[in-house]
Amino acid sequence: MIRIGHGFDVHAFGGEGPIIIGGVAIPYEKGLVAHSDGDVALHALTDALLGAMALGDIGKLFPDTDIQYKGADSRRLLRTAYQAILDKGYQVGNVDITIIAQAPKMRPYIDSMRTVIAQDLHCDIEQVNVKATTTEKLGFTGRSEGIACEAVVLLIKQNGTK
């Protein structure tokens, strides 16, 4: 059996950089406003994983009203959510992430993001795709007011599990 999940996240720029995207620190003059570390890619991916298994969303599992998640490392949140997926007998088939930002440029960091995500999901790097696009200077991302991200994940039932 397979399950598909979709996730979305957005954060506004604010404060000082760097920013963390896909588990990778990216030098930038602005930071991202968030309760945790503001990693839009890992937040969207975590939401996609949880959604695929009908486990709610990142806000349900890691509420921003809980002080223990203040400044939280999104890699830790991703690994915790993925463990819930593994516990239900599923594993990642593939992941596809689209980062939507006018700036900073993501291309130099994408291979590192893929490596980090593959490590956290215990899968091959070939199962993880990360790409970036702009909105051609339209909307809040086009005005460099923030960053958005979408993620799609395919989960596959592991052999021998109920």
From Swiss-Prot:
A single GO molecular function term of this UniProt record: metal ion binding
Binding sites annotated in the UniProt record for a divalent metal cation: D9, H11, H43
InterPro entries associated with the record: MECDP_synthase (IPR003526), MECDP_synthase_CS (IPR020555), MECDP_synthase_sf (IPR036571)
Pfam families per the UniProt record, alphabetical: YgbB
The species this protein was found in: Histophilus somni (strain 2336)
Family in the record: Belongs to the IspF family.
Gene designation: ispF
Entries under SUPFAM superfamilies matching the protein: IpsF-like
CDD domains: MECDP_synthase
Pathway assignment: Isoprenoid biosynthesis; isopentenyl diphosphate biosynthesis via DXP pathway; isopentenyl diphosphate from 1-deoxy-D-xylulose 5-phosphate: step 4/6
Cofactor binding annotation: Binds 1 divalent metal cation per subunit.
Record GO biological process: isopentenyl diphosphate biosynthetic process, methylerythritol 4-phosphate pathway; terpenoid biosynthetic process
Protein name from the UniProt record: 2-C-methyl-D-erythritol 2,4-cyclodiphosphate synthase
Complex formation: Homotrimer.
Transition state stabilizer (site feature) positions: H35, T134
Domain of life of the native organism: Bacteria
Keyword Lyase applies: yes
Known role: Involved in the biosynthesis of isopentenyl diphosphate (IPP) and dimethylallyl diphosphate (DMAPP), two major building blocks of isoprenoid compounds. Catalyzes the conversion of 4-diphosphocytidyl-2-C-methyl-D-erythritol 2-phosphate (CDP-ME2P) to 2-C-methyl-D-erythritol 2,4-cyclodiphosphate (ME-CPP) with a corresponding release of cytidine 5-monophosphate (CMP).
